[in-house]
Amino acid sequence: MKNKSVIEEADDVRRAVEMVQLGARMQMLEVETRLSREKLLRIYKEVRGASPPKGMLPFSTDWFMTWQPNVHSSLFMNLYRYFTGPAGVHGLDAILKSYHLYLDHIETGVIEPALSLTRAWTLVRFFDADLLQMAACTRCGGEFVAHAHDPVHDYVCGLCNMPSRAGSARRKTTTRKAVAPTHKTTAASRKAVVA
């Protein structure tokens, strides 16, 4: 094992804590820090209060092509491209800053984030491996995640050409939540009328 400076180790611990707080998986921590697996496990358990989940990382580019994940991953990639381009931030710092900004943007719209930090990290790795590319929508001009080497001259994004069932699961839960308080209000008003 190489000798590390105390400052480098402290920086790795800080990054590991931040990644765990954002929901990173152990595989990401192991790749992005120089800390031992045992130390990462201790950090994970201390921050989360539980052992890290087991299992494989996402490995398919197809997940990023479905409607909602494509919109979220495209937002993240545009933020990431800004940080690595004009802002001059690179590596893990660019991923973390982009992910923080992605979460801030999603939370203002009261939407659940579809993209986890580990998926965002995997997305960047897919771009680095030339498995994915950005494609400009011919209708709105926005840039969206697309398979690499797919023809993009007539590309139309998922927002301009929304699938017929897009958002139906969200509408069902919103409708159920809206119906429940109305029913309780009606029951309460009946009790008030009877009394």
Curated annotation (Swiss-Prot):
Example of a GO biological process term: regulation of bacterial-type flagellum assembly
Cofactor: Zn(2+)
GO CC entries: cytoplasm
Assigned keywords, A-Z: Activator, Bacterial flagellum biogenesis, Cytoplasm, DNA-binding, Metal-binding, Transcription, Transcription regulation, Zinc
Region named Disordered: 165-195
GO molecular function (one): DNA binding
Coiled-coil intervals: none
Cofactor, free-text remark: Binds 1 zinc ion per subunit.
Functional description taken from the UniProt entry: Functions in complex with FlhD as a master transcriptional regulator that regulates transcription of several flagellar and non-flagellar operons by binding to their promoter region. Activates expression of class 2 flagellar genes, including fliA, which is a flagellum-specific sigma factor that turns on the class 3 genes. Also regulates genes whose products function in a variety of physiological pathways.
Subunit structure comment from the entry: Heterohexamer composed of two FlhC and four FlhD subunits. Each FlhC binds a FlhD dimer, forming a heterotrimer, and a hexamer assembles by dimerization of two heterotrimers.
Family as reported in the entry's similarity comment: Belongs to the FlhC family.
Protein name per Swiss-Prot or TrEMBL: Flagellar transcriptional regulator FlhC
Species assigned in the record: Thauera aminoaromatica
